[in-house]
A protein has these predicted regions:
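Outer-membrane beta-barrel biogenesis signature
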Residues: 19-57, 61-65, 130-153, 164-165
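Surface-exposed strand-loop-strand hairpins of Gram-negative outer-membrane beta-barrel proteins
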Residues: 23-31, 59-83, 170-183
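Hydrophobic, lipid-facing positions within transmembrane beta-strands of outer-membrane proteins
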Residues: 37-39, 50-52, 56, 81-85, ...
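Residue-level signature of outer-membrane beta-barrel architecture
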Residues: 45-47, 58, 89, 101, ...
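Repeated loop/turn-to-beta-strand initiation elements of outer-membrane beta-barrel proteins
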Residues: 52, 94-99, 131-135, 201-204, ...
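Transmembrane beta-barrel strands of outer-membrane/channel proteins
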Residues: 56-62, 99-103, 152-160, 206-210, ...
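Outer membrane beta-barrel transmembrane domains
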Residues: 65-73, 220-335
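Outer-membrane pore/translocation modules
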Residues: 105-221, 225
Length: 335
């Protein structure tokens, strides 16, 4: 039986860490041999016991614009940058813990109101198990044949209200929940992943997760409860190249990311806001490079189908599902 290479690369994959409406953080692990790992869909890999992972992720969202006027007050959302810096630790072969600190930059067209700063710290626990005649926790050592078994993870996480939910923008200063630097209260997330390597070069990955929010009352007296976010993701990773002598691997990835947004409940609007929420299907094409103990992933993500809630005449510019494209890149290293 072939043995797996001793170098395991921990990499950033999209996991249900609570950074909703503000980008989604990522977790996972893979090696130069064995299952591949997508860019935006969480794999079912955990960190090796006693190993640390450092990761950085950027999700750059460029939005479509609809109003050609440059008059004051007509500025539309230009782009958002969702940065994340995180660290993970493998307490057991089957148990990994992560902490992620996001930093958001939200920029309007020239003359608009911008927002930037650190947002709510997120924590996550990932428990890994597999099926080999029976369900079991992931063991410390697995052969390449063992890695072809179905692997799963259960993910539990929350965000802590460390960001400034009452961050103000404009003149006179106002609080815009969509550009706030936090949710004001903890949010909670949970999810499942499943991974199956079905050939030497091909791996299928599936993910289901959900994020729930609490109502928060701002200093202005208004309150907001963001709608629940549900994600269903599927991905195929194909190994394009491996050079063991250089500890190098290159994978190509194709993904479908489905996002269901619940309606926001804003105290300034009677009942759930009719111009929020809906369904979005994103297509993702990406590459992942592995070298030594490092990994770099890059992908283009675009909405290919949407069914957004809106009242007649509402454009929803700057909303999820209205992007021209999203560029996602992740870098991670294990130590």
């Amino acid at each position: 039986m072939k043995s797996a290479l001793p170098i395991a690369l921990a990499i950033g994959l999209a996991s249900p860490l609570a950074c909703a409406h503000h980008g989604v953080a990522s977790l996972g692990a893979a090696g130069l041999e064995g299952p591949g790992a997508p860019i935006e869909t969480s794999s079912s890999a955990t960190l090796p016991e006693g190993k640390w992972l450092g990761l950085v992720k950027l999700d750059y969202a460029k939005f479509k614009t609809y109003d050609p006027s440059t008059a004051v007050g007509n500025q539309e959302v230009d782009y958002n940058q969702y940065w994340m810096v995180g660290i993970g630790y493998g307490f057991k072969p089957w148990l990994s813990i992560y902490a992620i600190q996001p930093y958001n930059i939200k920029v309007d067209e020239y003359g608009g109101t911008n927002s930037r700063g650190p947002t709510d710290l997120s924590l996550a626990m990932v428990v890994g198990f597999k099926y080999d005649d029976k369900f079991m926790l992931v063991p410390a050592n697995e052969s390449l044949d063992d890695l072809r078994d179905w692997h799963f993870t259960v993910n539990l996480g929350m965000s802590l209200p460390t960001g400034d939910a009452n961050h103000t923008i404009g003149s006179p200063p106002v609080i815009d929940p969509g550009k706030a630097l936090g949710f004001g209260k903890a949010s909670f997330n949970y999810g499942l992943t499943a991974t199956k390597q079905f050939s030497d070069n091909d791996t299928a990955v599936f993910e289901l997760n959900q994020i729930r929010f609490q109502r928060y009352t701002y200093d202005s007296g208004d309150s907001m409860k963001f709608g629940t976010e549900t994600r269903i993701n599927a991905a195929l990773s194909h190994r394009l190249m491996t050079k063991p002598e250089n500890k190098f691997r290159l994978d190509g990835n194709v993904e479908l990311n489905f996002l269901r947004l619940g309606k926001d409940n804003d105290s300034t609007v009677p009942g759930p806001d009719p111009d929020t929420g809906g369904d979005i299907l994103y297509g993702v094409l990406g590459l992942r490079f592995y070298k030594d103990n490092m990994s770099l992933g890059m992908a283009i993500k675009k909405p290919i189908w949407t069914d957004l809630n809106r009242t007649p005449g509402t454009v929803l510019q700057g909303a999820e599902g209205k992007e021209k494209y999203r560029f996602v890149t992740t870098f991670s290293a294990m130590f």
